[in-house]
Design a protein with these regions (language model features):
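Class I S-adenosyl-L-methionine-dependent methyltransferase catalytic core
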Residues: 1-149
């Protein structure tokens, strides 16, 4: 999923859960990973893992809903991974915030994970580059595009 574009990248792991995607990015040379996780005990476990792995200085853990966290983040991300609960609708507000606050641009890869029965993400300002399927897991790779008008 991550590929070679992760080296030296700034990564945003939304709905981080265990932080597996973010930690994988760090192991592949990401410069920094911001983990966003709503559940405080899970976020604490991410912090503990970062300390244990010796990568705490290259991580930030935000305890907040993704749609709120994306109104407070700064900088630009090279890679964004969003894995909301499968019963949730696509993250329109969250991705909209990323775009509006210029946290992503046309060079940013956004990956939206959803179940095979879940809806794909479709919204002005974003285009699907490719889709991938891993068993029952669907991955939608997106980029931002200019909106005409």
């Amino acid at each position: 999923i991550l590929g070679d574009e992760i080296a030296e990248a700034r990564v945003l792991d939304l709905y981080a859960g265990t932080g597996a995607i973010g930690f994988e990015a760090l192991s592949r040379g990401a410069a920094h990973v911001t983990f966003v996780e709503l559940h405080a005990p899970t976020a604490a476990a991410i912090k503990a893992s970062a300390l244990e792995l010796g990568v705490a200085k290259r991580t930030t853990v935000v305890i907040a809903p993704a749609e709120k966290a994306t109104t407070r983040l700064s900088g630009r991300f090279d890679f964004v991974y969003a894995d909301p609960p499968y019963a949730s609708p696509p993250p329109h507000l969250t991705f909209g915030n990323l775009r509006a606050r210029r946290l992503v641009d046309a060079s940013t890869t956004l990956v939206y994970e959803h179940g095979e029965r879940g809806d794909a993400f479709h919204s002005p300002g974003f285009t699907t580059v490719r889709d991938a399927r891993y068993g029952e897991v669907m991955l939608q790779f997106l980029r931002t595009v200019e909106i005409a008008g």
